[in-house]
């Protein structure tokens, strides 16, 4: 029997016939974890339009579920990840973290980057498994290697995070965090561009480089990162009036209360 046939046979046994709706009043744990991870469609397009909109607007979630099952059984690895993702966070129907882990691992082993990322989320949050930053880091690396640049931001955050509870072994590594943010920035990940620019501009954990810091911050701001526009406005407020006004007003358009406060202060100054 081929590997594809084995997967089809296993899937047919794993997937339940019907889904169970989420409770009318979801508990604290559901509210805490709903929304973690990401579907394949969002991961590939970089936009929220896709499966999440389809689920949010669905009149019959059972029909959506059957369609995802049909596509997964036909060999669509993205649909397999999507099923695992939904059962992982339990936002659209009652979660099943054990089933989610099985489905995500099956999709990941077939090369799906989003599935590797979602496995990382499962181990980071401890959903149906022991919390393990080491496992989360490994899965995030697999996701990045398969093209998911967002995983670089997750790795950067992970290496800056101290373990506050439990007995797992994890070492904060600020230089490693910076290197992951830099890898993500070089691949176009917008938040990573901000993180790199901020560190270079302020000499945070790395040698200060104003020119390089401004370069990355401007790239981030140009793609909608409000904090980057704020940083640029603050930086130029003391040395370049024209660029200060430009970034201040752009930050305001992005919804920045800080930039709006700066404008109000400018207006009342003599």
Please provide the spans of the model-predicted regions.
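Terminal, low-structured helical/coil segments at or just beyond the last alpha-helical repeat
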Residues: 234-270
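Canonical positions in the second alpha-helix
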Residues: 69-71, 105-107, 142-143, 182-184, ...
